[in-house]
Amino acid sequence: MLTVTAPAKVNLHLEVLGLRSDGFHELAMVMQSIDLADSLQFTNTADAQITLRCDDSSLSTGADNLVLKAAELLRARSGFNELGVSMYLEKRIPIGAGLAGGSSDGAAALVGLNALWGLGYTAEALESMAAELGSDMPFCVAGGTQLCFGRGELLEPVPPTAEGLAVLLVKDPLVSVSTPWAYQRCKELKGKNYLEGEVAFEQRRRDLREAPWLQPLRAGCPPPLRNDLQVVVAAETQAVQVSLQLLQTLPTPLAVAMSGSGPSCFALFGDQDQCDQAAADLSPKLKAAGLKAWACSLRSDGVRIAS
């Protein structure tokens, strides 16, 4: 049996630049892996069947699941149609949370099955396959701190931080946000201000590459945590409003923001002790508001084989 960990991500920067010719939004982002992670277990089978079970009954384990899509794609590319696997997913990342849980699980399937089946694909080849399945999936393969451009699939690594930065995540377990809805609503509300053309897009990419807070990520020059979807989603999602308000009452965070398309929100701290203390201090108010919380350190890697 093989086990792969699949970490969540937060967006330290999410800038919606404009619309591409293919209808997708052109993005300029900084994504960061954190140590809240799912676990995907693999067992070889001799029946050419690919199956998935999960400890969370609310998650579909049918053909729409990215784990199965990734497994089918990898087997098809290998040409070895006799390969089979039984997979078991332990969910720890909340579903529909803006934390790339599904994408990370799909990336874990690519990495794990590449090893289990002895296919020998490089990380770059796996990232390329991941991009066919989801915009966040290449990042989940690579992990750490990455500049993410295009739809999010074009990666440029950022120097790893030597500091023990941490995040306090909060989410209402009863609320999820549709990513397509969030981007459509963003276009409706902000489309008239979108940039147009590759020259304008590249200037914003260059500005982000040269941002002083990425040289490297550190507490002394914290990221401003821009998220262009935050104002759009928060306006229509009370759970996001409440989460941000509670996090903003804390005395020591470096910055506060929503992650991805939400509804998860987080506060960034200079070290894990401050983060843990904030989680303890805020716990009664979070419980009263029906919010769950996770105090997480930052990771320098993406999905990884654990055993």
Curated annotation (Swiss-Prot):
Binding site for ATP: P94, I95, G96, A97, G98, L99, A100, G101, G102, S103, S104
Superkingdom as given in the UniProt entry: Bacteria
Record pathway: Isoprenoid biosynthesis; isopentenyl diphosphate biosynthesis via DXP pathway; isopentenyl diphosphate from 1-deoxy-D-xylulose 5-phosphate: step 3/6
Catalytic activity: 4-CDP-2-C-methyl-D-erythritol + ATP = 4-CDP-2-C-methyl-D-erythritol 2-phosphate + ADP + H(+)
E.C. code: 2.7.1.148
Database matches in Pfam families: GHMP_kinases_C, GHMP_kinases_N
GO molecular function: 4-(cytidine 5'-diphospho)-2-C-methyl-D-erythritol kinase activity; ATP binding
Family recorded in the similarity comment: Belongs to the GHMP kinase family. IspE subfamily.
Name of this protein: 4-diphosphocytidyl-2-C-methyl-D-erythritol kinase
Organism: Synechococcus sp. (strain CC9902)
Classification of source organism: Bacteria, Bacillati, Cyanobacteriota, Cyanophyceae, Synechococcales
